[in-house]
Amino acid sequence: MPEPIVSRDSAIAADEADPLAYARARFVLPDGIAYLDGNSLGALPVAVPAALDETATREWGRDLIASWNANGWWTLPARIGDRIGALVGAAPGQVMCGDSTSVQLFQAIVALARLNPGRGVIITDGGNFPTDQYIAESAARLLGMQLVRVSPPDLPRVLDANTALVAFSAVDYRTGELWDSRAITAAVHGSGALMMWDLAHAAGALPFELDGIGADAAVGCSYKYLNGGPGAPAWIYVAGRHQATVDLPLTGWQGHAAPFALEPGYAPAPGIERARIGTPPVLSMRALDAALDVFDGVALADVREKSLALTDMVMRYADAALPGVLAVTPRDPQRRGSQVALQMPNAYEVTQALIARGVVGDFRTPDLLRLGFAPLYLTYTQVWDAMETLHQVLGSGEWQNPAFAARAAVT
């Protein structure tokens, strides 16, 4: 890592030397907003509105149903899947784009359990994002298996010959802790179990090597660091070595070997095509396809280096200038994703006061202010100034305004 950033002057110097500075122009960024919530919803890429207009006006409006062939709608899920695959270390033909993360979690968990019959336990992280736990719980109930919840560091305590699969997230959604995916995957395989990773908080924010670590399956969303927009389709990775035998539970017509033969019985398509389910949301996929252009020419190593520098700067600032605030994100850069979680009393009210000042982060119950860092469109100076704003909000007590205590439906 470069020298720590400990002043506004050093933040300015870091911006002047930033190899990713050019990428900021690839986004629509509102004036006066420090957007530190890219770990929840990424900013709008400049190319997306034109892509949506083209798809709606010319393709849908003029070419109508011919667009499935003439404009490549049919091949979008696999083509976008390969583009995402390139960002998560997956060779072509192993990632399919479509549906929601919850759906893809169900697909992956049930499929891996079926690939490893005779074992009765599914393991997930008790601190995992709720949908990961809910889907794992439902899958276990459906399959007549036991669900065991355990934090990744405690995995060796429960991993045994009865474990069918382990389903963890690469980055903890609350604290931003990055788990050692290579070591965990190796331990899981050593017990004869299979490994699934949720990369929702990793894809696009840091280099990941699904093939390299030997993952069996993975899922992820595309509206965070991939900037695909609200409700953008998710994706699933199935390692090539499993594709001939994997039995995915949701056997929709588009995953059939011959979808337009309209046969009454299901015969899976070869390769990753069998991971298709139903008709893809073309408008959302076109938006995502255009959004992925922001990564053209970008080295994920540069993204990672800037992310670590930004998160380090924020934690150093919190330690030095924010009494009563605890950064619960790991200091070790090898254990940190692309966010910082600040634990404090009245975190919800503080978050709302920051938003009113143009600093957008988010709140996670019970007491965390999360700040997410998307290196492609944030500057060091912008983040430094955001921390100064947090210092002012806490020092002035303005967060005590009763208006900031009103809970909205989405926090």
List each language-model region with its residue ranges.
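Pyridoxal 5′-phosphate
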Residues: 1-411
